[in-house]
Amino acid sequence: MTHVKLAIIGSGPAGYTAAIYASRALLTPILFEGFFSGIAGGQLMTTTEVENFPGFPQGVLGHQLMENMKMQAQRFGTQVIAKDITSVDFSVRPFVLKSGEDTFTCDACIIATGASAKRLSIPGAGDNEFWQKGVTACAVCDGASPIFRDRDLFVIGGGDSALEEAMFLTRYGKRVFVVHRRDTLRASKAMVNKAQANEKIVFLWNSEVVKILGDSLVRSIDIFNNVEKTTVTMEAAGVFFAIGHQPNTAFLGGQLSLDENGYIITEKGSSRTSVPGVFAAGDVQDKYYRQAITSAGSGCMAALDAERFLEK
């Protein structure tokens, strides 16, 4: 059994920033990278170019930004472990963290497990159907696959992430259709203008994918127009979900107060949770901003809050 002053569960901008601050404060933290968002390092590992993170006037690749943060945390003494924490016990002191058969204890804990992409429960999209056979939730991860080259691809969603994925897919697909159930988008004006200016992107308004068909791979989809009440079948090689995220809090076992959507509730103006000594940072507690820079900022807050807690 390993004991540390501070354990950080999750990576990404929040976890790595918390680790940088905590290790510089000589708290010798241990950070569990985890794969809560499908990949260690969080959602930015599947983002191409990040143009709005301060200090990079020419932009920076998402995975490179995360690798830089990780190396910076390790430089100051953070121990990074490529494991998931599968359960916790915050009812005892020190806190108990489980990772498979391994047990760790800590005096304070920062939760930075982020949020994972949501998937629609429609015929053909299941794990035993066409999931990862043309259906995915990560264009950056899978878009370069030969099965998508010069084919018609479909992105489901109406936010910034949906349009970013659509624009990325124009590198590979013949046409990229953005399927949205309404006639207006939630995305920012800048992102909408950029997508509408791309001649390879086609918008399907008031539309919903109701069925995915194929053989060993996706071949076509049925699209329902909820205004005209009609259904059409269109050839398709890929379907990409971009419909939001689910906070990764199931492993907590209900030991922290969560809101109606499963996000960790923190005290206003701090990272403190309902359990003293447990702090939360990043998208796991932020359903409003969900930006790399705000996640990093909240990681800093969590480290400072944890440091003050441990000094008591």
Swiss-Prot record:
Q: Which residues does the annotation say bind FAD?
A: 33-43, 283-292
Q: Name one GO biological process term.
A: removal of superoxide radicals
Q: InterPro entries under this entry?
A: FAD/NAD-bd_sf, FAD/NAD-binding_dom, Ferredoxin-NADP_redctase_2, Pyr_nucl-diS_OxRdtase_2_AS, Thioredox_Rdtase
Q: Matching PROSITE patterns, A to Z?
A: PYRIDINE_REDOX_2
Disulfide bridge positions per record? 138-141
UniProt cross-references to Gene3D superfamilies, sorted A to Z = FAD/NAD(P)-binding domain
- Does the record bear Translocase in its keywords? no
Q: How is the cofactor bound?
A: Binds 1 FAD per subunit.
Cellular compartment(s): Cytoplasm
The record lists the membrane-crossing segments as none
Is-annotated flag, keyword Glycoprotein? no
In short, the EC number is 1.8.1.9
**This protein's UniProt keywords:** Cytoplasm, Disulfide bond, FAD, Flavoprotein, NADP, Oxidoreductase, Redox-active center
- What's any one GO cellular component for it? cytoplasm
**Names of required cofactors:** FAD
Q: Which Pfam families match?
A: Pyr_redox_2
- Enzyme class name: oxidoreductase
Quickly give the catalysed reaction: [thioredoxin]-dithiol + NADP(+) = [thioredoxin]-disulfide + NADPH + H(+)
Gene Ontology terms for molecular function:
thioredoxin-disulfide reductase (NADPH) activity
| NCBIfam families tied to this protein | TRX_reduct
Assembly, per entry: Homodimer.
Family as reported in the entry's similarity comment? Belongs to the class-II pyridine nucleotide-disulfide oxidoreductase family.
Give the miscellaneous note: The active site is a redox-active disulfide bond.
User: Any idea what this protein is called?
Assistant: Thioredoxin reductase
| Gene source species | Chlamydia muridarum (strain MoPn / Nigg)
Q: Which gene encodes it?
A: trxB
